[in-house]
Amino acid sequence: MHTHCALHKIFFAIVLAACVSCSTVGQENPAYNKETEDKIKQVENNLSEWIQVVDSVNTYNLQQRMEYFKIRALSIAVIHDHKIEWARGYGVMDTSTRQPVTVQTLFQAGSISKSLNAMGVLKLAQDKKLDLYTDINTYLRSWKFPYDSVSKGKKITIANLLSHTAGLSLHGFPGYKRGDTIPTLPEILDGKHPANTEPVRSQFEPGLRFQYSGGGTTISQLIVQDVTHEPYDVYMWNNVLKPLGMTMSSYTQPPSKEKEKFLATAYRADGKEVEGKYHIYPEQAAAGLWTNPTDLAKYIIETQLSLQGKSNKVLSQEMTKLRLTPYIDSSAAFGVFIEEHGGEKYFGHNGADEGFVSVYKGSFDSGDGVVVMVNSDNGAILGEVMNSVATVYGWKDFYKPVVKKIVSISDTLFDTYAGKYFLEGDTFSISKKGSDYFLIVDNVQSFKINFSSYVEFFSTQIPIIFTFEKDEQGKVKDIYFKQGTQELRARRMKNQ
């Protein structure tokens, strides 16, 4: 989940899964030369958390962390010098069959789907079949966006949709169980039965600021279909996936029978298998891509080479530069988010579908990158693997952990903090069990916390610093959540 999204959402991308632990490296994984195998071992043994605690162990082994986080299947691809240096699968695709993960194993990519979608939409712009800065209703045929007074007379453009600056509702999608009646795109956009989400509507005028909207991405999917007169998955295969060599990947929902033997099974936070093994996402552009790290690495490499004018399998250098240029927001570009570390820019995206989470990063200039995917709702390990790759391959200042020292607090002081807090529909409880302190989310997920001062605490599992705020009488009233420059506030519930 990108930091621009509400911070409380992060809990549901990194909650701990429970159940069986994973086995080691899957069969049919390629072997490499000694130098590369040595690098792989270094990556496997150098996982690091977002925060370093003074006087404690700060690096871990991949297998240990998979067991600790109860991760069943994990797959990695590492890019170096504009090439896939290595790719490897770990664990099992399904806890019943115990089938090992390979580099071919397919995962749902969640919102990473948006990156390839933007590529497909920009291909239409490049071919002069649409204009990025024209009212979307110019291209919509099977449905029209219902403008109202909220948009203040301003028109939404495709550029707004791709950069999450359209001022639209509907952050994401839960998908549908296999066997459910699947809604059409117009039904989804209008929130009509059998759609399981609210209508996609204006919440503020377009072009004003960033607000993440999978609903807006779904409008872009319908535009692709209405302009090309092709099913979305067919257009994306012929114009994006196939040209990139992403031969294992597909936007087809549900996946074809030919792909079934490659599909990893999805698992929920409580360790239970997602009913039907995975959800179906008719919102293909926003969440419907099935892929693996090796295929996504091909997309990253093509983006890097196109940016340098060395390849144009899908987009020209000019169009690739446009795709990677933030639009209105300081970091949200077209289907990607841009960040900078040590003077190097990176493009990337996170993904989360039911029972799957993933992340990728690609550098602008150095030819480095990484993709990590797991078949669990637990995303805590993604950052740790990425940090390890960045450290082993010398990505300057990419991994700069927060350093904290644990302090002890009295029971009397803790009692002033204990209780329930409320934020955007979610309840957060501060409690103690034995000698340990916990943050409990909606009475379901429990995170061990440590105090770094008398008013500040953290969890190694959540990249957020929490701070208690008191009123004039010295009574605790709020908890501030801070992630980077983003802040949210959870208010203490009355009678606590």
Give the label of every model feature segment:
Residues 1-31:
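Bacterial Sec-dependent N-terminal signal peptides
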Residues 93-103, 381-387:
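A short, polar/charged loop-to-alpha-helix boundary motif
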Residues 43, 47, 92, 135-144, ...:
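Short linear capping/connector segments at secondary-structure termini
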Residues 46, 65-77, 96-160, 202-215, ...:
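Short active-site loop at a secondary-structure junction
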Residues 22-88, 225-238, 277-496:
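Catalytic loop of the DD-peptidase/beta-lactamase superfamily, centered on the K-T-G motif
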Residues 77-80, 136, 140, 251-259:
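Short, solvent-exposed turn/loop segments enriched in Gly/Ser/Thr/Pro and often Arg
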Residues 90, 94, 148-355, 359:
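Short, surface-exposed loop or secondary-structure junction motifs
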Residues 60, 118-119, 134, 218, ...:
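A generic alpha-helix surface/boundary motif
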